[in-house]
C-alpha cells in the first residue's frame, strides 16, 4: 500500500508531506481505520523496562507527541517523541528538510522546532497509549551553551511523570554548539546534574525513570572512549547511537551534498554502526545501547543487534519503506 502512496508524497515538499502524513495518521487512528498490529512479538528488557518488542520509533518524527496512538498502532515496541525544549521555538528557516532518494537519505536542519514541553505534556495526557514512551529533551536555541543544563533540567522535571524513559539529546548538528556538550568535562557536568535531579524526582514521584543520552556518529575513538567513561562513571541508564551525520561525502556530487544539516538514512548506516561497535566494546554490557541510523531493512536491524544494541529505532527507513519496515525488522529479530 505504502509503495503506491510514496510516489505521490515524494512529489511534495518534504516538510509539507511530513505534516500531511502525520495529520493523516492521526485522523485514521481516531476513526479506527488503522489496523491494529500485534506488538507483543519479542519481549525485551531495556533499561529495566519491559518492551513488547525491540523495534522503536526514533525521535524527530513526532516532535510534539501529536501522533502517539497512531504510531503505537503500527506495531512499535516503544515510541520516542521530541526533541522538545522548555519554550516553544520555530526552528530554522525553511526549506530545512530534503529527501535524497538516489541515496535513500534525508537531510534536515530543522533546529528543534517544537511547541514546548507544556504543549507536549498536554498531548501525552490526551493520548490513550499505555506502552513504553520515551521523551527526547533538548535546549532552546536562545539559551547560551553554558546554561544548557538549565533547559535540560526544566524538561526533565516536567517530563518525568509522563515518560517511561527520557533521552538527553546533545548530538543534533542543527543547534549551535550543542555537540560541544559531548566533550568530557561538559558531558560529565551535564549528566551529573541530570542524574542528581533524577534521584530527587524518583523520590518525589515514587518511580524511577531511566535516563539515556543520544550521541553523534561523527566521533573519533578518543571521543568514544571519553563518552564511554563518563556514562559509566555517572551511571547513565542507556545510550542511543546515533544521531544524524554532518559528513555528506557519501553523496558525492549530488546537488544536495552542499546543504547544511544532518544526513540520515542509508548514508549514515556505516558510520553509525562503527560508533555502535566501538561503544559496545567499551561499555562491555554495563548499560544498554539503542541502535539507530540507517536501518532500511530487517537485515540492518539484525546487524545493529549483532554489533551490541539491545534495541533499535527507525525513522528515515520508515519514510522510504513505510510500515512494512517495522514488520520486516520484527521478523528479522525473532
Predicted feature descriptions by range:
Residues 75-89, 170-172, 238-246, 294-295, ...:
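Glycine-rich phosphate-binding active-site loops on the catalytic face of alpha/beta enzymes
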Residues 88-104, 249-261, 317-334:
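C-terminal helical cap(s) of enzyme catalytic domains, especially alpha/beta-barrels
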Residues 13, 57, 79, 120, ...:
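Conserved, mostly hydrophobic/aromatic
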Residues 64-73, 219-233, 281-285, 295-312:
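Catalytic cores of alpha/beta
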Residues 22, 26-29, 33-37, 173-186, ...:
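Glycine/Thr-rich beta-alpha phosphate-binding loop at enzyme active sites
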Residues 49-56, 130-135, 200-219, 281-291:
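Short beta-strand/loop segments at the ligand-binding rim of alpha/beta enzyme cores
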